Amino acid sequence: MPRYLEGWLADVVKISLNRERINKVRERPIYLLSKFIKSTIDKNAIIAEFKRKSPSGLNENRDLEEYVKFMEENGAIGISVLTEEKYFGGSYSDLENAAKIVKIPILMKDFIVTEKQIDTAFNLGADAILLIVKILTERELINLYEYARNLGLEAIVEVTDENDLKIALMYDFNIIGVNARNLSSLEVNIRNARKILEMIPNDRIKIAESGIKNKEDIIELKKYGADAFLIGTTLMKDPNKIKELI
């Protein structure tokens, strides 16, 4: 069982534990997110997120095909697709559809606590998954990471505080995401994210997540070691912002 959790996090994990595996034959090659990030030289490495809503208040109803095409055409190096249904309005269909459209890495963004979810990510065309340290025991984190890697998928190991980071740095996780949003209170603390980013060794790929609103935010996060930027709410509200952020 995952860690002891409260509130909406406990609910979303309970739902995740019961989600069914989707059995389909993968038709898409695997696009390595790490490779796309490392090969980004003359622009900012942006992973554009598609989500219809969020517990923090977002509520947008955009066309997925139009959105992901636009992001790819305007320089995004990856697409993040929320597949959690209750709190983010996502679906496995969104992931499957996005995978048919773009030829850049796709992250299945969800509260992953079972191997079934990872199988589904692979089968529907995801190239990477998110593993959130906060909701997993150490043993679960390692097992799920290794399971994903054995399928050829990459995993972003997400941390929100120093405790999470301490666990993440004990293992050879090559991509670490630093979420500026506290998953319990939903408050964004960019200062804390900068502090965490600075503590991560440079041999890891560092992705800054949440609270990024403009080019200045990206410039600032780069000073603290961020290699890539996962941006959702800002781009869902105004997709044209990608041109400014790149």
From Swiss-Prot:
Pfam families: IGPS. One of its GO terms (biological process) is L-tryptophan biosynthetic process. Gene3D superfamilies: Aldolase class I. It catalyses: 1-(2-carboxyphenylamino)-1-deoxy-D-ribulose 5-phosphate + H(+) = (1S,2R)-1-C-(indol-3-yl)glycerol 3-phosphate + CO2 + H2O. Its EC number is 4.1.1.48. It comes from the Archaea. Keywords: Amino-acid biosynthesis, Aromatic amino acid biosynthesis, Decarboxylase, Lyase, Tryptophan biosynthesis. PROSITE patterns: IGPS (PS00614). GO terms for molecular function: indole-3-glycerol-phosphate synthase activity; phosphoribosylanthranilate isomerase activity. InterPro entries: Aldolase_TIM, Indole-3-glycerol_P_synth, Indole-3-glycerol_P_synth_dom, Indole-3-GlycerolPSynthase_CS, RibuloseP-bd_barrel. Pathway: Amino-acid biosynthesis; L-tryptophan biosynthesis; L-tryptophan from chorismate: step 4/5. It is an enzyme of class 4 (lyase). HAMAP family: IGPS_A. Belongs to the TrpC family. This is Indole-3-glycerol phosphate synthase. The lineage of its organism: Archaea, Thermoproteota, Thermoprotei, Sulfolobales, Sulfolobaceae. The gene is trpC.
